[in-house]
């Protein structure tokens, strides 16, 4: 629930600090399992079968698999699609273990992980659907350089990398600031946060949109970007601003109390 009395706002992140080992363990386990799920959707043909069961026409298996690739067994484009899922899981696992101090109950750990898996699965299926897959539109996936010659792939991969690194870096910078006892209760506005108040939100939206762009093309990429942008603009950012306003109000009241009672003497 969101902080405050505004029932229209919903906070997806707990603002209470707690270790929450079980919830975190569930989240980490499911995010790690997602990597294997996404890979097997491609490598074992589960994704192609699912697309066809849903009534779609999938790409041919030879466009997905590459027996000569001893690393993944996939064509270079689908190797990149797998890499996107690895990057998203790794970033979120690192965040929950080394950065986040917020409580994560069992329900949140399961729900947030499931949400990410659903989105990643949709991306994987769209990368296999002949109507949306870059592999079905003449993409040369026999080599990495040839794959990167596609504007959709190169732009998507660049935006994904920048967004993921920006989100992770900004969160580590804020974590380092908060760990200094002298900064207790102070808002952080340095590092990447000096560029934008909600740089981590924008970075997340960027890499999510880029992930979708690489898998499902421009329309799906724009739709995904728009979905997350709208969510953050109408829910995430207002919730955060309300939370920060409450903290400022509490700090102001404490200061007034200290002055009134001569706590600075």
Which residues make up each language-model segment?
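Intramembrane catalytic core of multi-pass membrane enzymes that act on lipidic substrates
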Residues: 47-142, 155-161
């Amino acid at each position: 629930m969101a902080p405050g009395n505004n029932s229209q706002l919903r906070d997806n992140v707990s603002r209470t600090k707690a270790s929450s080992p079980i919830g975190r363990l569930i989240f980490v386990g499911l995010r790690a399992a997602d990597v294997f799920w996404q890979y097997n959707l491609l490598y074992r043909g589960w994704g192609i079968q699912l697309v066809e069961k849903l009534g779609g026409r999938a790409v041919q298996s030879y466009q997905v698999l590459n027996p000569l690739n001893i690393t993944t067994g996939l064509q270079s484009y689908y190797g990149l699609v797998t890499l996107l899922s690895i990057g998203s899981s790794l970033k979120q696992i690192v965040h929950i273990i080394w950065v986040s101090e917020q409580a994560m109950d069992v329900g949140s750990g399961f729900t947030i992980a499931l949400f990410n898996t659903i989105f990643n699965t949709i991306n994987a299926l769209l990368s296999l659907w002949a109507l949306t897959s870059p592999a079905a539109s003449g993409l040369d996936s026999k080599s990495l350089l040839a794959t990167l010659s596609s504007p959709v792939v190169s732009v998507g991969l660049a935006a994904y990398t920048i967004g993921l690194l920006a989100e992770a870096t900004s969160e580590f910078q804020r974590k380092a600031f908060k760990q200094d006892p002298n900064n207790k209760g102070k808002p952080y506005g340095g590092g990447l946060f000096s560029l934008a108040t909600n740089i981590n939100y924008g970075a997340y939206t960027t890499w999510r949109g880029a992930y979708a762009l690489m898998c499902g093309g421009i329309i799906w990429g724009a739709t995904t970007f728009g979905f997350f942008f709208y969510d953050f603009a109408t829910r995430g950012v207002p919730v955060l601003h309300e939370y920060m306003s409450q903290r400022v109000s509490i700090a102001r009241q404490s200061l007034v109390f200290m002055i009134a009672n001569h706590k600075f003497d």
